[in-house]
């Protein structure tokens, strides 16, 4: 096959014999000194045994993470050198240990530069930032009654609509449990007596008119008429008893 290649090359060109074929040597004698300057070095090269033959690997590939990987590379290079004669440079241990820094080491160095918190606790003190006066297990002391009166924030704010107000009284009546007794004036009493003399029962419309005229509420007008009717019934009952005959018995 080689003779056919040479013959075809010589016959195709007129001066074929003048061209000299470049000898690249045997496969066993391949090394760095056979590489030309214009040739790009391969980044990954493997032979039939699976050993990496590339000379331009990165530092992370040249230097292993442990002694086990370094010993493996040295053993593999020695075995391949004995079998094929190719020289493989072993990584420099000083370069691996000094120049390369793992990400974990850099993170540790960066963490060491972080400033510590200003509040440091000694061994005898509690590490929790809880006030010593009020331990975690005990409840905070409740303010006393005198303190409630002095502190406006702790006092319950009372709005005007929370208080009861009487129309006849000026100001507020406070928070008494019982309603104060309504004191009617002579004019109010006279007008109510006149109305009761004509009508002992009031309609809703008439009650509203009287309440507006006398400056009273509907409830006050209603209560006054109820009391006035009870008094009128009591007076009529006493009159009926006094008018009855002295025998008081049934007469056929």
Swiss-Prot record:
Where is the protein localized?
Nucleus
Which sequence positions fall in the DNA-binding region? 177-236
Which PROSITE patterns does UniProt cross-reference here?
A: ANTENNAPEDIA, HOMEOBOX_1, HOMEOBOX_2
Write out the GO MF terms.
DNA-binding transcription factor activity, RNA polymerase II-specific; RNA polymerase II cis-regulatory region sequence-specific DNA binding
The record's SUPFAM superfamilies line, in alphabetical order, gives:
Homeodomain-like
Disordered, as annotated region: 114-151
Annotated motif Antp-type hexapeptide, positions? 158-163
Q: Which residue windows does the record flag with biased composition (Polar residues)?
A: 115-130
**Coarse class of the protein's main subcellular location:** nucleus
Q: Which GO terms describe its biological process?
A: anterior/posterior pattern specification
Might you report a single GO cellular component term? nucleus
Give the source's domain of life in one word.
Eukaryota
Q: Which family does it belong to?
A: Belongs to the Antp homeobox family.
* Function noted in UniProt: Sequence-specific transcription factor which is part of a developmental regulatory system that provides cells with specific positional identities on the anterior-posterior axis.
Which protein are we looking at?
Homeobox protein Hox-D5
Q: Quick one: which gene encodes this?
A: HOXD5
